[in-house]
């Protein structure tokens, strides 16, 4: 046995040496033919092209960029872009590729962050960080530009080995989320092409058309020039200056307020609503921390987290124009207008409070917003997050944490979210209670990015202490005559459609939309101020995608506590005797540890609410009462009745909502349906969402064992929902009845 292992090891070592030798020989050949590889060669050629009149800029903007955006960006835009090659901007293409994976959940030590536009700013710096070019960086001539370019070789490989005509891809194609990756340099490409002939670009998708391919190859042959962007307009610059002026006022009150605003908006795309032209994409901005004040070029403080120590005496909050292609899976649009700025003025400037000194950036302070921002009014903090509640939750749903099965199996596939009324959530009594619980509400990010998973026990104890203290506080409040009522749920002040949200999980990604969409779900959350704050600081501000296994596991396990807390808040509105019964239905087959935690800590609030029920279907009746309470702020999106289908066809298509059980479980996570109308040239779009049922969502692994297939169902909505469609159905309106009938017959 030992000899067998030794022989296998020898074979492996020999193979590695052969491949390394081949790459070395290839490099020598390339050096001989086209000179040494040096990113300054491309930089010099780009400067020369930029300084001389040329049609290259127009060619890129009019012909090349649209192809890249339509055929390349869909895979090459996010942290999980293959080989870290981001093609959503010229800077990403110039940066090149890297063999390391960003999503590497079992790493023992935190990795070095490699964030575009932040951790390095030019190709030379990226080469020092292990990135290699995909464009030619040797002699700049037409032959070298194609023969020494990984991108050109990838495109040619696809043309030589196009996608098979089979309806389903075979085992040669792996599109799973945790697939292995091969990231060849130009020196390694020959061996790569021999071993993976069908791995050209676009991978696992149809090849480029002849015109598209020729356009990109011509561009690469001519030097792959990508022009500098025009500066923003004077009108945009004035709006930027005004907002930066507001955020960088000198008072301590405003310095702390700006820090709070930044730490909640650093993942969003801000835009000035009043400056958006009809039918045009807004100019978006990232809010960043800079070493330099207004009027000087931005010098980004490239910290792992938004609350890490900046190592400067004064932080400036600046607006950096977004220059990458906008993609839905990371896009969090955040409109800035006079109405919003007036509210910020009211909450953070006009309110009566006094910041004595700026809080520390030490992890045990900065990672806990209830400590770091204790000097800001609770009402200001809660109102700020509620005003754009979808965006607040979207930071989790569209951020880097929300990717992969293990990251998402902490939530149910479909649930509704409500919020506690601000006047209730920010009362002086509650404020004093939050102050007393600051230590119990500490978050895993204080352990930074190389953490030990065993620390979970410490956080579990603190969460248990907090829940017990909270229920004691609530019991005392109810005994004092302050019973829960429907009015304790925020109604959006009668005009804000962020008052209720629907969250859909699509196995390894998720969506959050405004309003109560779909049939009444199995579970729901009611979120108060400390819960909303901790969701953000656990999953957005405090999460480091480059963190080690312990950090990522702690984050996932702590999220169990927050889910349980939100669900317990909802249960508190039900009659006391029904709470345990409903909760048990949500956590069937739960492990003994969870059962002990829930029964010993979560369900100790046993005071009656002030709500009178008229049926025994308490949960459904509560949903109805909440819906009535929020009816004036329900958005009109996603309603089938608002489509342009005929009345009969609306009713027919809505029959899909009745699919359930095993028939529903066979469907893809997201099905996009395009219906060609009988009386219009503009098609109608619908999305069919599969909701997978579970006995409980508390198991980190072995999710399949917790699946409750017989209770799977679907939600049909009008319009597009989700970022990762699995299948597209193209149907004529006259054939809707046939489509529905076929869907109802699905058995395997």
Where are the predicted features?
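C-terminal motif of bacterial Sec signal peptides marking the signal peptidase cleavage site
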Residues: 19-21
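Aromatic- and Gly/Pro-enriched helix-to-coil junctions and flexible linker segments
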Residues: 23-748
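Bacterial N-terminal signal peptides that target proteins for export
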Residues: 2-13
């Amino acid at each position: 046995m030992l000899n067998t292992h030794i022989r296998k090891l020898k074979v492996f070592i020999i193979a590695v040496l052969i491949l390394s030798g081949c790459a070395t020989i290839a490099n020598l050949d390339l050096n001989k033919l086209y000179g040494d590889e040096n990113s300054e060669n491309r930089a010099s050629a780009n400067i020369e092209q930029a300084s001389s009149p040329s049609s290259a800029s127009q060619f890129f903007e009019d012909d090349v960029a649209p192809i890249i955006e339509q055929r390349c960006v869909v895979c090459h835009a996010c942290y999980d872009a293959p080989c870290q090659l981001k093609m959503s901007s010229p800077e990403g293409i110039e940066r090149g590729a890297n063999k390391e994976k960003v999503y590497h959940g079992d790493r023992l030590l935190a990795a070095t962050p490699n964030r575009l536009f932040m951790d390095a700013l030019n190709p030379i710096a990226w080469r020092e960080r292990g990135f290699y070019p995909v464009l030619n960086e040797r002699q700049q001539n037409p032959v070298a530009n194609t023969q020494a370019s990984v991108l050109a070789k990838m495109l040619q490989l696809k043309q030589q080995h196009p996608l098979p005509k089979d309806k389903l891809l075979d085992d040669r194609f792996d599109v799973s989320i945790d697939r292995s990756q091969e990231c060849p340099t130009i020196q390694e490409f020959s061996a790569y092409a021999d071993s993976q002939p069908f791995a050209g670009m676009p991978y696992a998708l149809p090849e480029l058309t002849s015109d598209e391919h020729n356009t990109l190859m011509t561009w690469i042959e001519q030097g792959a020039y990508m022009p500098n962007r025009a500066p923003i307009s004077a009108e945009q610059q004035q709006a930027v200056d005004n907002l930066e002026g507001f955020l960088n006022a000198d008072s301590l009150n405003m310095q702390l307020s700006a820090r709070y605003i930044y730490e909640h908006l650093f993942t969003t795309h801000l835009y000035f609503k009043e400056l958006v032209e009809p039918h045009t994409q807004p100019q978006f901005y990232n809010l960043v921390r800079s070493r330099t004040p207004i009027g000087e070029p931005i010098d980004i403080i490239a910290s792992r987290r938004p609350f890490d120590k900046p190592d400067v005496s004064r932080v400036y909050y600046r607006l950096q124009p977004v220059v990458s292609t906008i993609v839905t899976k990371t896009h969090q649009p955040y409109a800035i207008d006079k109405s919003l700025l007036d509210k910020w003025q009211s909450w953070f400037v006009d309110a009566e409070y006094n910041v004595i000194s700026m809080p520390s950036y030490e992890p045990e302070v900065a990672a806990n917003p209830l400590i770091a921002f204790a000097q800001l009014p609770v009402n200001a903090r809660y109102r700020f997050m509620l005003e754009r509640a979808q965006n607040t939750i979207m930071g989790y749903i569209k951020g880097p944490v929300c990717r992969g099965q293990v990251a998402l199996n902490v939530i149910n596939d479909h649930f509704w979210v409500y919020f506690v009324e601000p006047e209730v959530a920010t009362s002086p009594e509650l404020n004093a209670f939050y102050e007393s619980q600051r230590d119990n509400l500490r978050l895993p990010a204080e352990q930074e990015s190389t953490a030990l998973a065993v620390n979970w026990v410490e956080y579990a104890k603190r969460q248990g202490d907090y829940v017990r203290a909270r229920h004691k506080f609530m019991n005392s409040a109810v005994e004092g005559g302050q019973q829960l009522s429907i009015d304790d749920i925020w109604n959006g002040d009668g005009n804000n459609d962020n008052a209720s949200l629907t969250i859909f999980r699509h196995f390894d990604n998720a969506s959050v939309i405004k309003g109560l969409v779909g049939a009444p779900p199995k579970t729901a959350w009611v979120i108060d101020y400390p819960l909303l704050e901790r969701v953000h600081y656990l999953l957005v501000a405090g999460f480091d995608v480059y963190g080690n296994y312990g950090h990522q596991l702690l984050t996932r396990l702590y999220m169990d506590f927050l889910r349980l807390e939100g669900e317990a808040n909802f249960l508190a509105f039900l009659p006391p005797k029904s709470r345990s019964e409903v909760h048990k239905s949500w956590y069937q087959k739960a492990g003994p540890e969870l059962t002990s935690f829930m029964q010993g800590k979560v369900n100790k609030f046993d005071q009656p609410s002030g709500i009178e029920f008229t049926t025994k279907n308490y949960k459904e009746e509560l949903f109805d009462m909440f819906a009535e309470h929020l009816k004036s702020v329900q958005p009109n999106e996603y309603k089938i009745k608002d489509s342009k289908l005929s009345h009969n066809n609306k009713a027919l298509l809505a029959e899909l909502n009745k699919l359930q059980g095993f028939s529903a479980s066979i469907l893809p996570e997201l099905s996009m349906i395009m219906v060609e109308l009988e009386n219009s040239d503009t098609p109608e779009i619908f999305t069919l969402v599969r909701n997978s049922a579970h006995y409980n969502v508390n198991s980190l692994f072995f999710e399949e064992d917790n699946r409750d297939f017989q209770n799977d169902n679907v939600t049909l909505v009008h319009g597009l929902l989700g970022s990762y469609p699995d299948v597209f159905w193209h149907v004529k309106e006259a054939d809707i009845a046939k489509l529905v009938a076929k869907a109802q017959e699905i058995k395997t």
